[in-house]
Amino acid sequence: MRILIRNTWILLLGLLLAIGVSARTRHGNDVVFVSELPPEARHTLQLIRQGGPFPYEKDGVVFGNYERLLPKQNRGYYREFTVKTPGVRNRGARRIVTGGELNSPRELYYTEDHYASFRRIQE
């Protein structure tokens, strides 16, 4: 009986810790510094700042934030840009999502798992 109670408490503690981690990443509170990004992401940032040209037709389209992982904003606030993935023939899973003005965004987010999680890019 004691083992069952102990295991239940361990399980509950694990769930609480997992929920805490999820809440931190939900609104992009996890941070990645530009210097920590893969070189392809740094190149995409450079293209965003200079206004292109972008290698993919869908770069710069409105990102709907349907996953609701980023802070809520009006439609059109967020835009997405592809980060090339070496060895992948399609667009891959990596993206930079910007918020605000197209060429001078106020917010930058990086996802390497196709919108399952985001990290805010810190200059």
Question: At which residue positions do the language-model features occur?
Answer:
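Bacterial N-terminal signal peptides
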Residues: 3-20
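Small/flexible residues
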Residues: 4, 8, 26-28, 97
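Residue-level detector of functional hotspots within protein domains
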Residues: 7, 18, 34, 39-42, ...
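N-terminal secretory signal peptides
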Residues: 23-72
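Functional cores of ribonucleases/endoribonucleases
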Residues: 55-123
